[in-house]
Amino acid sequence: MVKPRIIETDEGIQGEFDVQTYNSMMRSLRDRGWMETGHIIRSGIAHGLALEIGPGPGYLGLEWLKKTESTMLLAVEISPEMTKIAERNAREYGLEGRVKYVKGDAHQIPFDDNTFDGVFTNGSLHEWSQPIRVFDEVYRVLKPGAKCFISDMRRDMNPLVRRFMKLMVKPKEIRPGFISSMNASYTIDEIRSILNQSNLKESIVAKTFMGFEITGMKSE
């Protein structure tokens, strides 16, 4: 039986210790090749100007820039401390000229309608207090015909997978936050119901090993 969802903060990761610890975890995932970059590119987001929601320390978007040509990235992050880490990491990649991090909230994306050739985000959906509103914001800022890719954990993952993931999370100081995120994540049925109430209702939801991927497109 799947336990009820436990709501998590929508303020992102704040505080120097938590930010640095999360950066270490994401760098480790990057080094293991566990980024969702290939999935994003295969979904059709591989050119022009893209938006990343909740980039955290920035590795996903930076890997996307590294693996695509003549692309640019704008990223909206609610945590000022995390933005500083992402900017530092962009300099390490030598990609600071192709990415800009903006302090902002996904519930009110600070960009005009029909701006982006693609929108992607990983691991932030469970933090959104009003996911329907964010889905509608994603739809609004996409250009007609442009695509979005949204991935996250799911609360109804196999218990053995859940246990494995908890053990794999390092450094161990991040494990309580990881468990909190798992408990705040949605089931497949829940996320389909939410999408059906948004402008992204035509999106496809696919189950993955430990989560799900949403792929959608703004109508022409």
Q: How would you name each of these model-derived features?
A:
Residues 1-46, 63:
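Conserved class I S-adenosyl-L-methionine
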Residues 51, 57-108:
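Class I SAM-dependent methyltransferase SAM/SAH-binding core
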Residues 95-96, 112, 201:
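Conserved H-loop
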Residues 107-118:
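A short acidic, Gly/Pro-enriched loop at the edge of an enzyme's catalytic core
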Residues 118-130:
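A short SAM/SAH-binding and catalytic strip from SAM-dependent methyltransferases
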Residues 132-144:
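A short glycine-rich, Lys/Arg-flanked "PGG" loop and its adjoining helix->strand segment in the class I
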Residues 151-214:
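C-terminal alpha-helical "lid/dimerization" subdomain adjacent to the S-adenosyl-L-methionine
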